[in-house]
Design a protein with these regions (language model features):
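Conserved SAM/SAH cofactor-binding pocket of Class I
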Residues: 56-141, 149
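Class I SAM-dependent transferase core
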Residues: 1-65, 71, 101-118, 216-217
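Short "lid" loop at the C-terminus of a central beta-strand within the Rossmann-like core
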Residues: 126, 144, 167-171, 189-191
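SAM/dcSAM-binding transferase cores
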Residues: 175-226
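Residue-level signal for inorganic ion chemistry
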Residues: 29, 84, 203
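Short loop/edge segments at beta-strand edges and connector loops
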Residues: 42, 122-124, 185-187
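Conserved beta-strand signature within the Rossmann-like core of class I S-adenosyl-L-methionine
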Residues: 159-169
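Helix-to-beta-strand junctions that scaffold the AdoMet/dcAdoMet cofactor pocket
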Residues: 88, 156-158
Length: 226
């Protein structure tokens, strides 16, 4: 894949420093994956396509050239927030993940790539007490979109956006409404090379989420909103 060309088609142009940051990120991912099991994808072309490029397709849903705060819930090895931070150094990023080994890996990434304004939080999303704090909240490949909505919507500022990246989903609009949001659009596209389908939902926060949300994760999982 011609990473530079494909990003230009998204309206993203990287300088030499940013390209070097992506190269270093790839090297760290492969190195630490041997002991941490961070990803099942290690081939360089596939990492650039399915992790780096895929993360940056969020520009289809939002203008990241603005000075905004972004919270990435369940980021794993840093997707989509670290690629977004490399491409848009102006954004302030908070990453929340429940697995400490992933947070430790991301500390190394942030240090080695000289990234600033990145905060790494080891916590479960439902226990992360920053309601109505972020312009944008992202999540990638959460198994159940309704669970993702309950975990993430409380974190979004009124007039901010939740941008879940999904492959498929079964969504009731009443769930979005119950959590203070409205579905603005579904953005559907295909990854280059393999033509696999991707979807980004653009959910705007129109009113404050009720204080009772999010519930405990056991309650969320046992009885997800419908």
């Amino acid at each position: 894949m011609d990473f530079i060309k494909e990003l230009k088609d998204l309206g993203i142009e990287l300088n030499d420093i940013q390209l070097e940051q992506f190269k270093k990120y790839y090297e760290l991912l492969v190195e630490y994956n041997k002991v941490m099991n961070l990803t099942g994808i290690t081939d360089i072309e596939m990492v650039y396509l399915k992790h780096f490029y895929d993360s940056l397709t969020l520009v289809k849903a939002y203008d990241f050239t603005k000075d905004i705060s972004l919270c990435d819930v369940g980021s794993g090895a840093g997707f989509p927030s670290i690629p977004l931070k490399i491409a848009f150094p102006n954004i302030k990023v908070v990453i929340v993940d429940s697995l400490n080994k992933r947070i430790e890996f991301l500390k190394i990434v942030v240090k080695e790539l000289n990234l600033t304004n990145v905060e790494l939080i080891h916590a479960r999303a439902e226990e992360f007490d920053k309601k109505e704090s972020f312009d944008v909240v992202t999540s990638r490949a959460l198994a159940n979109i309704n669970i993702g909505l309950e975990l993430c919507m409380p974190l979004v500022k009124v007039n901010g956006y939740y941008l879940p990246m999904v492959v498929s989903y079964d969504l009731g609009n009443n769930v979005i409404k119950e959590l203070g949001g409205e579905l603005i659009s579904e953005i559907k596209f295909y990854l280059p090379i393999e033509n696999s389908e991707r979807k980004i939902l653009k959910v705007r926060k129109v009113s404050k989420t009720k204080d009772k949300y999010p519930r405990s994760f056991s309650q969320i999982k046992k009885n997800p909103l419908k």
